[in-house]
Amino acid sequence: MKRKSVYTCLVMLLMSLALQAKDKDVAVAEALLKRLLPSYIESFQFQKLKGEKDCFTIESVKDKIVIGGNNANSMAMGLNHYLKYYCLTTVSWYADIAVEIPEELPMVGEKVVSEARVDTRFFLNYCTYGYTMPWWQWKEWERFIDWMALNGINMPLAITGQEAVWYKVWSKMGMSDIEIRSYFTGPPYLPWHRMANIDRWNGPLPMEWLEHQVSLQKKILARERELNMKPVLPAFAGHVPADLKRIYPEADIQHLGKWAGFADAYRCNFLNPNDALFAKIQKLFLDEQKKLFGTDHIYGLDPFNEVDPPSFEPEYLRKIASDMYATLTAADPKAQWMQMTWMFYFDKDKWTSERMKALLTGVPQNKMILLDYHCENVELWKRTEHFHNQPYIWCYLGNFGGNATLTGNVKESGARLENALINGGGNLKGIGSTLEGLDVMQFPYEYILEKAWNLNVDDNKWIECLADRHVGCVSQSVRDSWKRLFNDIYVQVPRTLGTLPGYRPALNKNSEKRTSNVYSNVELLEVWRKLNEAPSDRRDAFRLDLITVGRQVLGNYFLDVKMEFDRMVEAKDHQALKACGEKMKEILNDLDKLNAFHPYCSLDKWIDDARKMGDSPQLKDYYEKNARNLITTWGGSLNDYASRSWAGLISDYYAKRWEVYIDTFIKAVGEGVEVDQKQLEDELKEIEEGWVNATDRKDVRKDVHSTTDGLLSFSTFLFSKYQRLVK
């Protein structure tokens, strides 16, 4: 009898544990819902579906919306589908933007059933951690991770906090505190340090930063894993401090190629993987990282990103890959190597077919995952015999430097992706996005990621639904605007970097070509007109639409006026020159005012968030300088690469440069003398350096109108002002 009682208890315990395990995903999905819509928690019910294949279902049962999924990630995707297509709402990836849905939840007619077309959905780029995320706290990360889950992402790049791991490794190797922290760059530059592009720039990195990032990464990884994601952590790819040569003089350490015009003092060093020291460092790093962060056995290793390897000999490259992989599996037998393929595109003349094959086949089959990084431009799977059968992920990049240009051949990219899913081979394992920054419209990434699921939504319906959820209702004028954007404006492969106001002024320089567009600005003006006919600007997504389209129209028009200004310089027409100059200044002023209507279109948030990272006035100033530096002068030859169309930055930085340029040429033409170009450039550089090193700025928030119709009124006013001027 006693044995029977024990047996019964054991069975009940096992059943209880099984039930708990089954319900864990439901609890996670409910917690996500509570974070987004706490008032609606009783209106939804989540159910666990059987099966390994990612899938979700949505149906109405009595007075509840019932969402099923095989795991919490699939349930989140199902929740987002309901919010998008039934509640007409867009969940922002920004933490401060509330989710707006109808008071009475719409019922679901026919049951929705969807299954994933690919197993892996990847997101992020090393650069995103510099251009968008360096000052993020847990609040920002929590919303962003929820956004990733809502869009079905299950393999995010997760590189926060790795400097703390490296600090432990280099300390054990015999380096001093100041040597190690001086080897690191300033916070927003860490992505390029991690990719072995630059060392030491804006260092030394404060110890407080390292400690903060460890705490943050633990929260990030816990939440990502909770939502059924497999974070991609870093591994050792050969990048070592120059000071290591002092401790290990016999080590095979060589210089990597120079990068982006940086001086030799910032050049990176590479340890040959066949040196015994390489395996030692790899094991130290992975062991220390596992202690802090655990592992999902997928590691990002990216040697030679935008820099030349010590040799391009195929046998050398094959051996490098083979030796590097051997050190990885010696430390973690389950390891898989994830490699971005940007270098094959960026240095396509150097990375010949033979060289690419050598690197890719140096790793055993199915042990290297390739990110086909920039597929909207070049699909490398077509040039590499399907990556020589190694697994790969088709990725849409869509943005460089985090600037907000309306660019990206979105519709064409969708067609390319559909073709890849049919003809890309059995080793196409996933879909992803590798955007450099988030200061862009969300919709291209939502569009691409949704194609990972068999939802059978055609482009016309998709764009109509997008328009509806941005404005919060069915508005024909907004639908027309979005159809034009999708079919006629978003047709250009991402190559432009912002608009001309964000570039250092120069007479007849190629910056005009870099900011030009294939569409007519008159077409975009018509989009703006239709948006201004919307019934309301209450929804945040629509407010961003108004600002983004409006500032692009003004930015494009500024280019036209500037080219006219340069022609008047050559014609020596003083009166016409003055008129053009005043017009340019006026456009810049209007741009600043338009951007001031949204906190994410303002310099204030970027600087405030940077300063909040510091616990002392000195640290606050240090972080602010780094924040100012990245979005302006950057470093090396990358001046203005990360330009932003932000209120405050336009008035206090870009406009100041343009005023000097305009006034200098007006004065010179009026006096009948030539402009000293060297002196002009020196004056502009003085403005730039002074601004980067300053800690005072205009508070643009006092200019922001908080009324719900303020932006729409101002946008309509600007449209009326410029509609007859834009050609």
Placement of each model-derived feature along the sequence:
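Bacterial N-terminal signal peptides that target proteins for export
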Residues: 1-8
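Hydrophobic h-region of N-terminal signal peptides that target proteins for export
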Residues: 12-20
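Contiguous, structured surface segment used for ligand recognition
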Residues: 21-118
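Catalytic-core regions of glycoside hydrolase
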Residues: 41, 89-90, 96-105, 124-128, ...
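Second-shell loop/turn segments in exported
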Residues: 64-69, 130-134, 207, 312-313
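Active-site-adjacent substrate/metal-binding segments within catalytic domains
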Residues: 118-137, 148
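C-terminal substrate/ligand-recognition segments
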Residues: 514-535, 547-570
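C-terminal amphipathic alpha-helical interaction region
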Residues: 561, 566, 577-727
